[in-house]
Amino acid sequence: MLYQILALLIWSSSLIVGKLTYSMMDPVLVVQVRLIIAMIIVMPLFLRRWKKIDKPMRKQLWWLAFFNYTAVFLLQFIGLKYTSASSAVTMIGLEPLLVVFVGHFFFKTKQNGFTGYSVQWHLLAWQF
């Protein structure tokens, strides 16, 4: 639980720090520095597991990794130029809730009790 709280604090402060760095450097450079630090940490694990992945799936994984991490971080930090850090964190925090609603209304997926409880909790927390 302690590591989850620590990860939440680091993640939630990243957009606030990103907004402050606009006066010092370009947002693309901020994203590159973040990803280089993450690459240094994850590279030993990556090299160990990479050979076990099927070759046809590797190209799909590269595209998924690019769009899921690089493009999303870049778009979030570029979006900070046009809005405040608090509204950006609010929009990003609502993403899990929107995924549940899109899945329910467009794809007719059924949610379990925990999902319903967490949606109600998010709606209640959003009111305050």
Curated annotation (Swiss-Prot):
Location relative to the cell: Cell membrane
Keywords: Cell membrane, Membrane, Transmembrane, Transmembrane helix
Annotated signal sequence range: none
Topology term for the membrane: Multi-pass membrane protein
Main location: membrane
InterPro entries, per database record: AA-Vitamin_Transporters, EamA_dom
Residue span(s) of domain EamA: 9-110
Pfam family, one: EamA
Statement: the UniProt record of this protein carries the keyword Transmembrane helix: yes
Transmembrane annotation, as ranges: 5-25, 27-47, 60-80, 87-107
CC annotations in GO: plasma membrane
Name of the protein: Uncharacterized protein HI_0976
Protein's organism: Haemophilus influenzae (strain ATCC 51907 / DSM 11121 / KW20 / Rd)
Organism placement in taxonomy: Bacteria, Pseudomonadati, Pseudomonadota, Gammaproteobacteria, Pasteurellales
